[in-house]
């Protein structure tokens, strides 16, 4: 199955998906030193996003969230890619400055934690491969 959205980035990426059904604030919601979700209200609290394809509806919170995404990247704890239903500037800028491929405008209800996907930010495609 292929899903279509709009992409930012160049590299085709494959990986395991981790899905949150709640909006995510990177500032105070993700530990930039460990890549662990620390937001007490998150449905994926305690999970690591390191090396996974992070899926969530949209970002929320402070503009500092872009720099938290960048810190995750610098610390080697960033997601491999990000898929969101609704693109907003905080997450988009964070992905761009960190070199993390991003696909927006995708119906995330089709994705489940543990699935394997391939994303192509140039075409905006998300392909479920396992």
From Swiss-Prot:
Signal peptide: none
Ribosomal protein as UniProt keyword: no
Name of the protein in question: Phosphomevalonate dehydratase small subunit
The EC number(s) this enzyme carries: 4.2.1.182
Subunit note: Heterodimer composed of a large subunit (PMDh-L) and a small subunit (PMDh-S).
Catalytic residues of the enzyme: 62
Taxonomic lineage: Archaea, Methanobacteriati, Methanobacteriota, Thermococci, Thermococcales
Keywords of the record: Isoprene biosynthesis, Lyase
Functional summary from the UniProt entry: Component of a hydro-lyase that catalyzes the dehydration of mevalonate 5-phosphate (MVA5P) to form trans-anhydromevalonate 5-phosphate (tAHMP). Involved in the archaeal mevalonate (MVA) pathway, which provides fundamental precursors for isoprenoid biosynthesis, such as isopentenyl diphosphate (IPP) and dimethylallyl diphosphate (DMAPP).
Family, similarity comment: Belongs to the AcnX type II small subunit family.
One Gene Ontology MF term: hydro-lyase activity
Catalytic activity reported: (R)-5-phosphomevalonate = (2E)-3-methyl-5-phosphooxypent-2-enoate + H2O
CDD domains referenced in this protein's UniProt entry, alphabetically: AcnX_swivel (cd01356)
InterPro entries associated with the record: PMDh-S-like, PMDh-S-like_dom, PMDh_S
Keyword Lyase attributed: yes
Pathway(s) the chain acts in: Isoprenoid biosynthesis; isopentenyl diphosphate biosynthesis via mevalonate pathway
GO biological process: isopentenyl diphosphate biosynthetic process, mevalonate pathway
């Amino acid at each position: 199955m292929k899903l279509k959205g709009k992409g930012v980035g160049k590299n085709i990426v494959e990986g395991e998906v981790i899905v949150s059904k709640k909006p995510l604030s990177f500032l105070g919601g993700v530990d930039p030193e460990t890549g662990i979700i620390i937001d007490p209200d998150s449905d994926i609290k305690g999970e690591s996003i390191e090396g996974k394809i992070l899926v969530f509806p949209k970002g929320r919170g402070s503009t500092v969230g872009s720099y938290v995404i960048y810190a995750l990247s610098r610390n080697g704890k960033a997601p491999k890619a990000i898929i969101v239903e609704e693109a907003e500037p905080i997450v988009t800028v964070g992905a761009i400055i960190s070199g993390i491929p991003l696909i927006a405008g995708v119906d995330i209800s089709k994705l489940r934690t543990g699935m394997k996907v391939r994303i192509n930010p140039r075409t905006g495609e998300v392909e479920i491969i396992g």
